[in-house]
Amino acid sequence: MPAKTTSARLTHLDDAGLPTMVDVSDKQVTARSATAESRVHFPAAVAAQLRANGLRSAKGGIVETAVIAGTMAVKRTHELIPFCHPLPIDGCRFEIDWAGAQVLQIVCTVRCVHRTGVEMEALTGASVAALTVYDMCKALSHTMRIGPTKLLSKRGGKRDIGAAR
């Protein structure tokens, strides 16, 4: 029988079906981590141009700017996603590199010691970094595509998901 990976209940709805923030005050404080990925797909000519320019655009260093924007997004996730708790982020790391001739892979890993996980922070960081890459390159093409964006792993809560990074 496969491992259970979902809950039968939506945690952000109360008994009356109204939206609510989950009360984590009784949860155990543990080391938490999550890793998420997003990808940016480029037309062949744009990918070739970016490779030739060392991932620099007219706006500056693409990777450097994406890391800064993604990090800022991680720290502000609770301001963007209504029921995310503000968390003391202990670490945020990005790996950005080519994953094929035309695909830039963005991996964001977030760590904290708290009562709730950092999945949304990792997903937000990877997403905003991908959006920043798009913004940095849109002068070259508007046919770039972002996705998929997905959670690769999480550690430290009720259940671990995916391979640790």
UniProtKB/Swiss-Prot annotation:
Pathway recorded for this protein: Cofactor biosynthesis; molybdopterin biosynthesis
Presence of keyword Iron: no
Pfam families given in the database record: MoaC (PF01967)
GO biological process, one term: Mo-molybdopterin cofactor biosynthetic process
Active site per the UniProt annotation: D135
Catalytic reaction(s) noted: (8S)-3',8-cyclo-7,8-dihydroguanosine 5'-triphosphate = cyclic pyranopterin phosphate + diphosphate
Keywords: Lyase, Molybdenum cofactor biosynthesis
CDD domains per record: MoaC_PE
GO molecular function: cyclic pyranopterin monophosphate synthase activity
Domain of life: Bacteria
EC number in record: 4.6.1.17
InterPro entries recorded: MoaC, MoaC_bact/euk, MoaC_sf, Mopterin_CF_biosynth-C_dom
Ligand binding (substrate): F83, C84, H85, M120, E121
NCBIfam families linked: moaC (TIGR00581), PRK09364.1 (NF006870)
Quaternary state and interactors: Homohexamer; trimer of dimers.
Role: Catalyzes the conversion of (8S)-3',8-cyclo-7,8-dihydroguanosine 5'-triphosphate to cyclic pyranopterin monophosphate (cPMP).
HAMAP family hit by this protein: MoaC_B
Family: Belongs to the MoaC family.
Protein name: Cyclic pyranopterin monophosphate synthase
Organism the protein comes from: Xanthomonas campestris pv. campestris (strain ATCC 33913 / DSM 3586 / NCPPB 528 / LMG 568 / P 25)
